[in-house]
Amino acid sequence: KQDPMLTTEKVTELEAKLDRLKNYSRPKAAEEVRRLAELGDFSENVEYQLAKGKLRGINSAMLTIEHQLKNAEIIEPNTQHEQVAIGHHVTIEGGGKPKTYLILGSIETKPEQGVISHVSPLGSALIGKKVGETVELKIAGKEVSYKITKIE
């Protein structure tokens, strides 16, 4: 089951992508399939098979995005900073310099940019905690602990 948590920015991005697929990519791909179908023998027509595959891929992408948008739960800006919640920036310390993470839904996760999912091991350990609390978890088979120093 896909995580439904999305920011309004991600919803806007998905709506734009769906619009491009519906109004540009799909009609163009469908026209290419029609053009190649007119050439006759489908079994020997590699271009036709590739065009059909591309059209199936576009249709699949459209269905996925439509499903994501239909089931989306918008991450509302949270002005309460007592406890860690989805949408918060959380600064933690442990084993080196402080690190700040933004906790979002799994569709928007970019760990290399400090964006983690609320269902990731670290994200789920942080949810509901307060400044000053320590979370302990196992990462790559190793016990680690982090102290929460700031919630924004």
Model-derived regions: residue spans:
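Residue-level signal for pocket-adjacent positions within structured domains
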Residues: 1, 16, 31, 37, ...
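N-terminal cationic and glycine-rich segments that engage phosphates or anionic surfaces
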Residues: 1-57
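Short amphipathic alpha-helical segments, especially helix-boundary/capping motifs
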Residues: 6-11, 63-65, 99-100
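Conserved, well-folded catalytic cores of nucleic-acid-processing
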Residues: 21-24, 36-39, 65-72, 129
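Internal alpha/beta loop-helix hairpins
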Residues: 46, 50, 55-78, 82
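Non-DNA-binding regulatory cores of transcription-related proteins
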Residues: 75-152
